[in-house]
Regions:
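Generic structural hydrophobic/aromatic packing signal, biased to beta-strands
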Residues: 1, 16-19, 57, 113
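Helix N-cap / beta->alpha transition motif
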Residues: 3, 19, 102, 130-138
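A bilobed periplasmic-binding-protein/Venus flytrap-type ligand-binding module shared by bacterial periplasmic
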Residues: 12-29, 43
């Protein structure tokens, strides 16, 4: 048995998704939503707040469980095997490079969907990434919170199979996988974005 962190260290945990027409119609609300999530992440990352968070999550309104079952940031030492215990950084709520949208990760997910036959790999993948993964909204929110413009440090994604994903060559990545299927490449036609004048 492997944990998700053993398969992909630092993988994205959650994704905020909104409809494009909503984001275009309510850009200020979109930025405010991202700011609220960043502030909540910063609050959750502060160990001074962990007891309060455990109490809230353990309450009947949420998980209805015992507080001691809820771990924030400090992995349990309980283990089911005799191997040396490895601790991974879990529940990373806030920090340098966290929470920033990653077009590299989005692109990797597109390659996986194409790899397993769920979608054709989009020939116009750059256009799709620019429409789907709007880094500008995050950058605006982080600047307004005076976090600075958090830069994404792009590095290859490497999973347990030791095949590095290079975002510069997604087709080459698909063609060099040990476990592979035939995949198709097709132009994905996107509707024109709708912008609302302020």
């Amino acid at each position: 048995v492997a944990t998700d962190m053993e398969i992909w260290q630092g993988h994205p945990g959650k994704v905020l998704g909104v409809r494009e027409d909503w984001a275009n119609r309510y850009p200020n609300t979109h930025v405010a939503l991202v700011k609220a999530l960043l502030e909540a992440g910063r609050y959750c990352a502060d160990t001074k707040n962990h007891q309060e968070i455990r109490e809230i999550l353990a309450s009947r309104n949420y998980l209805a469980t015992k507080e001691e079952y809820i771990q924030l940031g400090e992995p349990s030492n309980y283990s089911c095997n005799l191997d040396k215990h490895v601790e991974y950084a879990h529940h990373m709520f806030f920090g340098d490079g966290l929470n920033r949208p990653s077009r590299t990760e989005h692109l990797w997910m597109m390659t996986q969907m194409a790899r397993w036959g769920h979608i054709p790999f989009p020939r116009n993948w750059v256009e799709i990434l620019e429409r789907v993964c709007r880094v500008g909204t995050f950058s605006t929110a982080s600047r307004e919170l005076e976090l600075g413009d958090l830069k994404y440090r792009r590095s290859p994604i490497q999973l347990f199979d030791d095949v590095a994903f290079d975002a510069e060559d997604p087709i080459g990545y698909l063609n060099h996988l040990g476990i592979e299927r035939n995949f198709t490449i097709a132009e994905v036609h996107l509707a024109s974005p709708t912008f609302v004048a302020a």
